[in-house]
Swiss-Prot record:
SUPFAM superfamilies: Pseudouridine synthase (SSF55120). It catalyses: uridine(55) in tRNA = pseudouridine(55) in tRNA. The active site is at 41 (nucleophile). The keyword Cytoplasm does not apply. This is tRNA pseudouridine synthase B. NCBIfam families: TruB. It comes from Nitratidesulfovibrio vulgaris (strain ATCC 29579 / DSM 644 / CCUG 34227 / NCIMB 8303 / VKM B-1760 / Hildenborough) (Desulfovibrio vulgaris). Responsible for synthesis of pseudouridine from uracil-55 in the psi GC loop of transfer RNAs.
Length: 304
């Protein structure tokens, strides 16, 4: 039985296979527990954070903390049911009236907080069913929106009807929706034709390994795995004793002691990673007041 890994593998997902298919291939290397943070559509490539072993338990915190950077290409003049080039064309329209200045003005307007329409072909759920299943069954899908935050929006190049752009956005932003809404505002339709995730907090493509390389060299998996402590870089690391570890494993909150965190004064809501005497992650914790006492409350245990 191969040694089980506990950490993150930053994968450079190729365009074509689904995120689940990529995860399945890595699992065949002998890893029992495996997951990922932030699905990429089959058409999209780039950074996919693969979670191994105990790291599968930090997925929600990675997603909550992390912004993402995408570079994409769109094409004016048509609309599809999926809002990308892989869908069925539902409408075409002339685009020659559109200028580069028109495109740049709309991309600039993406900045800030806004309500974004969720694509009808997506994993978002309605009454427990993913929208894509309702769409494939020919059933009407409700219009759903979500709040997204975009801190960078730029046109990389414009060779109409093709436009290359880059955005830095909050987790869960649909880039297909940005392309679709741009097409509506220009009056000609638009579809996403290519997408690369360049960054998924806290890792970029410079840290990523191709799927082919990972599968071709299974003996190097361990050296490619990033420790859990590095996945949450802004969380304080708090060392605990064997006795304290026993309490944590029983779900008992630990008394807060400032000297455990470089004499940091107590503040509610501070998240940290507890490390055992070997500096192995034991649990994710958060400062809280329980029964009038200042404590580290266990959010998630990082053990089997």
């Amino acid at each position: 039985m191969p040694v089980q890994q506990h950490g993150l593998l930053v994968l450079d997902k190729p365009s074509g296979p689904s995120s689940a298919q990529c995860i399945s291939k890595v699992k065949r290397l002998g890893q029992k527990k495996i997951g990922h943070a932030g699905t990429l559509d089959p058409m999209a490539g780039g950074v996919l954070l693969v979670l191994l072993g105990h790291a599968t338990k930090i997925s929600g915190h990675l997603m909550a903390d992390g912004e993402k950077v995408y570079a994409g290409t769109l094409r004016l003049g048509e609309t599809t049911d999926t809002w990308d080039a892989e869908g069925t064309v539902t409408a075409t329209a002339p685009w020659h009236h559109v200028t580069e200045a028109d495109v740049r003005a709309i991309v600039d307007s993406w900045l800030g907080s806004s309500e974004q329409e969720v694509p009808p072909y997506s994993a978002a759920k309605h009454q427990g069913q993913p929208l894509y299943k309702l769409s494939r069954a020919g059933r009407e899908t409700p219009v759903k929106t979500k709040t997204v935050e975009i801190s960078l929006a730029e046109v990389v190049w414009c060779d109409l009807p093709h436009v290359r752009f880059r955005v830095r956005c909050s987790s869960g932003t649909y880039i297909r929706s940005l392309a679709h809404s741009l097409g509506i505002r220009l009056g000609c339709g638009a579809v996403l034709t290519e997408l690369t995730r360049e960054y998924s907090h806290p890792f970029g493509l410079d840290m990523a390994h191709t799927l082919d390389a990972v599968l071709a060299e299974p003996g190097r998996l361990a050296e490619r795995v990033i420790p859990i402590t590095h996945a949450l870089p802004h969380w304080p690391k708090v060392g605990i004793s064997l006795q304290q570890e026993a309490s944590v494993r029983n779900g008992i909150p630990l008394p807060y002691q400032p000297e455990m965190v470089a004499d940091m004064p107590f503040m509610e809501g501070v998240k940290a990673i507890l490390l055992d005497t070997r500096e192995v992650p034991v649990a994710l914790v958060e400062t809280a007041i329980v029964g009038g006492r200042q404590v580290w409350a266990v959010l998630r245990g990082l053990w089997s």
